[in-house]
């Protein structure tokens, strides 16, 4: 795991596993809402009434609907696929 993903992957994986509703703001200002179904190095699959593949390069901010507790650093992160 590269250093840049040491926070991103566990955070997204926690949101996915706990099915936390999120708002994703894109760099062009558009707001998307749903639950993270899956993710990889380049994209997030966001599910609401439809599934949308969102490229991470287009994302500005990910805002969970409730506070999220990250797993402790001594546990390895699981892959982002369901």
Curated annotation (Swiss-Prot):
Keyword ATP-binding recorded: no
Domain Sm: 9-68
InterPro entries named in the record: Hfq (IPR005001), LSM_dom_sf (IPR010920), Sm (IPR047575)
A biological process term (GO) from this entry: regulation of DNA-templated transcription
GO molecular function, one term: RNA binding
Highest taxon, organism lineage: Bacteria
Pfam families (alphabetical): Hfq
The entry's keywords: RNA-binding, Stress response
Quaternary structure and interacting proteins, as annotated: Homohexamer.
Family: Belongs to the Hfq family.
Task of the protein: RNA chaperone that binds small regulatory RNA (sRNAs) and mRNAs to facilitate mRNA translational regulation in response to envelope stress, environmental stress and changes in metabolite concentrations. Also binds with high specificity to tRNAs.
NCBIfam families xrefs: Hfq, PRK00395.1
Protein name, entry field: RNA-binding protein Hfq
Name of the coding gene: hfq
